[in-house]
Design a protein with these regions (language model features):
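Basic, alpha-helical nucleic-acid-binding regions used in initiation and control of genome expression
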Residues: 1-174
Length: 174
C-alpha cells in the first residue's frame, strides 16, 4: 500500500466549492432547480412560523402539519408574502391563545383558518392586478443572518436574486 499523492486539495475551499457548484448547475434541469427553490422556501417559512409561535409561547409541534394542510393557493404566494401571512395569522392565534387560557389547539385552529383567509385574499388581489411585487411582503431584517445554504443556492444553483423572496416559485422564473 502507499499514500496517494495525487489528491491535492486546493487551499481556497471557497473557490473550489464555487467551481464545483458552477459545474453542477448546468446538469440540473429547470424542474430540479424549481424543486430546490421550493424546498428552501418551504423550510424558511417553517422556520419563520416556528420562531413566531415560540415568541408567543405557543407550541410548535404542529408547524409542518399546518403548513402542509394549506390550500393550493398557498403555493402561489412568494416567500415574502407567506411571511406576511404567517406573521398576521400568528397575531390572531396569539390572541386566541391568551383569551382561551393557553389552549394551544384553539390557537392553532385560528392560525390555520387565518392563513387560509389571508392567502385567498392575497391571491384574489394579485389576480386582479391590485398588488405591486413588494406589497404585503415581509422580507428579513437587514441584520438577519441568512443561512449559508440559501447564500450558496442563490449564488450558484438558483441565481434568482430577489425573486427568492418576491416571486412564487415557478419554472418561468428559473
Amino acid at each position: 500500500w502507499s499514500y496517494v499523492d495525487d489528491l491535492i486539495l486546493p487551499d481556497d475551499l471557497d473557490a473550489a466549492l464555487k467551481r464545483m457548484l458552477d459545474a453542477w448547475r448546468p446538469t440540473l434541469d429547470k424542474h430540479a432547480r424549481l424543486w430546490i427553490w421550493r424546498q428552501l422556501a418551504d423550510r424558511e417559512a417553517s422556520a419563520y412560523l416556528t420562531s413566531l409561535l415560540r415568541r408567543h409561547r405557543i407550541g410548535v409541534h404542529r408547524v409542518d402539519e399546518i403548513l402542509r394542510s394549506q390550500d393550493e393557493e398557498w403555493t402561489r404566494l412568494s416567500l415574502g408574502r407567506k411571511r406576511y401571512v404567517l406573521w398576521s395569522s400568528v397575531r390572531g392565534a396569539a390572541s386566541q391563545f391568551l383569551s382561551s387560557g393557553g389552549n394551544e389547539d384553539a390557537a392553532l385552529e385560528v392560525l390555520s383558518r387565518e392563513m387560509r383567509r389571508r392567502t385567498r385574499w392575497l391571491v384574489v388581489k394579485a389576480a386582479a392586478g391590485e398588488l405591486r411585487r413588494t406589497d404585503y411582503c415581509f422580507l428579513p431584517d437587514t441584520g438577519w443572518r441568512r443561512p449559508l445554504m440559501i447564500d450558496v443556492a442563490l449564488e450558484s444553483v438558483l441565481k434568482i436574486g430577489d425573486d427568492y423572496w418576491l416571486a412564487a416559485p415557478s419554472l418561468g422564473d428559473i
